[in-house]
UniProtKB/Swiss-Prot annotation:
Identification of the protein by name: UPF0301 protein Tcr_1827
Pfam families: DUF179 (PF02622)
GO cellular component: cytosol
Domain of life according to the entry: Bacteria
Family annotation (HAMAP family): UPF0301 (MF_00758)
Entry similarity comment: Belongs to the UPF0301 (AlgH) family.
Amino acid sequence: MEHLNSLEHHFLIAMPNLTESWFDKTVIYIVEDNEHGTMGLVINLEHNLTVPELLDHFELTVEAPENYADQPVLMGGPVDLEHGFILHEPQGTWQKSLPLRDNLAMTVSEDFLKAMADGTAPEKIVVCLGFSGWEKGQLNDEIQANNWLTIPYNEALLFDVPNDQKWQVALNTLGISPESLSMDAGHD
C-alpha cells in the first residue's frame, strides 16, 4: 500500500463506518498536514445560514446580493464552530490569508467579508464555520481503520459540484459507487 508523506491538498471521503457520526458522507479538504497534526474543512455539510445572513450578522450591507444569494455557509467541522474559514480563488491580498496551492487560498479576515459584501471578493468561494482536526498520526490511523478514502485536490469538486452531490462525485473519481463500499478494511 502506498503511503502519502502529506495529505495536504487532498480530499478525504468518509466511509460507511462513519455513518452514525458527525462525518457521515462528508468530503473534507485537507488544509494542513504536518508534524503538529492535520486540519481540514468539510466542504459538503450545509449550515442553516446562507452567506448573506452571515454577512448581515457582521452588520455588513450586501451591495451585490446576487453574487452569493443562495450560497450556504458550510459546517467545516466540529471544532471551533464560531470561527470562520473561507477557501477561495484567486488568492488575492487579504489581511489573514494563507496561500494553499496554485491559485487557492484560505482567508480568515474581516476584510474578505467586507469584499464579499461590496461585491469585490472572488466569485469562487467556500465559506465554513468550524474545522476538522486530528492530532499527529491520528488521521493516518483512521485511514488504516478504513474510515476514509483519499483523492487529490480537484478544483471542480471544491467549487462547482453541488454540496449534496460532492460525496458521490468524489467516490466516482475513484470508480466507486456507494453501494460497493464495505465497512471492513482489506488489510490487517
